[in-house]
Regions:
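Condensing-enzyme catalytic core mediating Claisen C-C bond formation in acyl metabolism
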Residues: 1-58, 104-118, 122, 150-156, ...
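Generic secondary-structure signature for well-ordered alpha-helical cores
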Residues: 17-20, 34, 61, 65, ...
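Electropositive phosphate-/nucleotide-binding environments in soluble metabolic enzymes
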Residues: 2, 6, 46-53, 77-81, ...
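Active-site-proximal alpha-helical scaffold in enzymes
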Residues: 11-18, 125-146
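Extended hydrophobic packing segments that form well-structured cores
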Residues: 139-140, 145-146, 151-166, 170-178
Length: 178
């Protein structure tokens, strides 16, 4: 077995009516968005702009929330630049500002911006199953199941995945009742 590539995850979807009878706290899909921007690197007009802006805007609008409302964020982190471009695209900070915005420990455990609270793909499981594990960690955070890494009072989470060569983006906003 290989820590870098082995593993898996699952998410079970059901109706709100059935979820009320489950043993675990239900987590609701509040909004989602998707974008595909290019089919090859040579077709990218600007390497600093990703489809996260479109997928994020759709997800936030459908959920009726803004980036400022989010308690915990899970993003696909294939490379450091992927994280920076995603945070900018989703609207957590301005274009070209991500590296300064996270400086000083903002995203470290206990920082004021809970990001990739499981450690992220660069720390424990890129590539392979990490996409689904973004959702799994977001759900666990919202249920209060994360022990030492638990974000206090987390009610809203964003999970964002990228595919291809930063060409495909999917964003989901999840939430729980207070």
């Amino acid at each position: 077995s290989c820590l870098v590539t082995d593993g898996g995850g699952a998410v079970v979807l059901t109706s709100a009516e059935r979820a009320r009878d489950l043993r675990r706290r239900p987590v609701e899909v509040l909004g989602y968005g998707e974008r595909t921007t290019n089919t090859s690197m040579t077709a990218v007009p600007d390497l600093t702009v990703t489809g996260a802006a479109g997928s994020g805007a759709d997800a936030f609008a459908r959920a009726g929330v803004t980036p400022a409302d989010i308690d915990v964020v899970q993003v696909y982190d294939s490379f450091t630049i992927t994280v920076a471009l995603t945070l900018e695209g989703l609207g957590f900070c301005g274009r070209g500002e991500a590296l300064d915005w996270i400086a000083g420990g903002r995203i470290r455990p206990g920082g004021d911006f809970p990001l990739n609270t499981s450690g992220g793909g660069l720390s424990y499981c890129h590539p392979g199953q990490f996409g689904i594990l973004l959702l799994v960690e977001a759900v666990r955070q919202l249920r209060g199941e994360c022990g030492d890494r638990q974000v206090p009072d987390a009610r809203l989470a964003v999970a964002h995945g990228t595919g291809g060569i930063l060409s495909t983006h999917a964003t989901v906003v999840l939430g729980v009742d207070a």
